[in-house]
């Protein structure tokens, strides 16, 4: 426990005395009081470079008063690396530490096929063509296609767990998934594509009607994923209780809207 008691002060000619309360704070990690070089506890005097890096009184003379951290930071700040997707056409270069941020938004990032027994991965538009040619019939492809912002019927068996659909305006696959749990059936929708501006952003609405009662779930922003997860979602889902299920068939309606093009 670190404590600090501020002294009493006097104000004005009347000698008014103002006492400030004692304040205390708790240090949760004592390791921050160790020298980052030798890992021994810091003691006075403590040496600090102009960039804020610390060294204890024993280490500073050994380093000839030169900060060991600053040169490495300068090196990292001067390293430009190419995108891992350069073999697929990306020409972007970025600072070493920005790699993960760029990969999430790179239009050339690979997306995995949502079919469980398929190991194909490719650009989201190539994945669209692959899925069309490899995994479905022409009749299914025609049936499970709709226009953006227009609600359409998307019935699916709970045991199927996943249904792939698309919109006329985009070469993008959308995954409608359901998960049976003890409290009911979770239904969620995701866009199989990277988080690139070129892909666009989508909102969606799911509705489920039973005995003339309708449940509606609206999401202002659909999640974009490069690989579909088959684990029960923790957020962004509609939950249909078991007492509202009448069969294995989920008779739902779905509407997807591209929000990035709206004024």
Swiss-Prot record:
Entries under InterPro entries matching the protein: Sina-like_RING, SINL_plant, Znf_RING/FYVE/PHD, Znf_SIAH
Residues binding Zn(2+) 1: 83, 90, 102, 106
Positions annotated as zinc finger (RING-type): 35-71
The keyword Transferase appears for this protein: yes
Domain notes: The RING-type zinc finger domain is essential for ubiquitin ligase activity.
Catalysed reaction equations from the record: S-ubiquitinyl-[E2 ubiquitin-conjugating enzyme]-L-cysteine + [acceptor protein]-L-lysine = [E2 ubiquitin-conjugating enzyme]-L-cysteine + N(6)-ubiquitinyl-[acceptor protein]-L-lysine
Biological process terms in GO annotation: protein ubiquitination
MF annotations from Gene Ontology: transferase activity; zinc ion binding
Record function comment: E3 ubiquitin-protein ligase that mediates ubiquitination and subsequent proteasomal degradation of target proteins. E3 ubiquitin ligases accept ubiquitin from an E2 ubiquitin-conjugating enzyme in the form of a thioester and then directly transfers the ubiquitin to targeted substrates. It probably triggers the ubiquitin-mediated degradation of different substrates.
Keyword Metal-binding: yes
Zn-finger (SIAH-type) residues: 78-136
Keyword line: Metal-binding, Transferase, Ubl conjugation pathway, Zinc, Zinc-finger
Binding residues for Zn(2+) 2: 113, 118, 130, 135
Protein name: E3 ubiquitin-protein ligase SINA-like 8
Pathway involvement of the protein, from the record: Protein modification; protein ubiquitination
Similarity remark: Belongs to the SINA (Seven in absentia) family.
EC number, UniProt record: 2.3.2.27
Segments for region (SBD): 75-261
Pfam family, one: Sina_RING
Enzyme class: transferase
SUPFAM superfamilies in alphabetical order: TRAF domain-like
The species this protein was found in: Arabidopsis thaliana
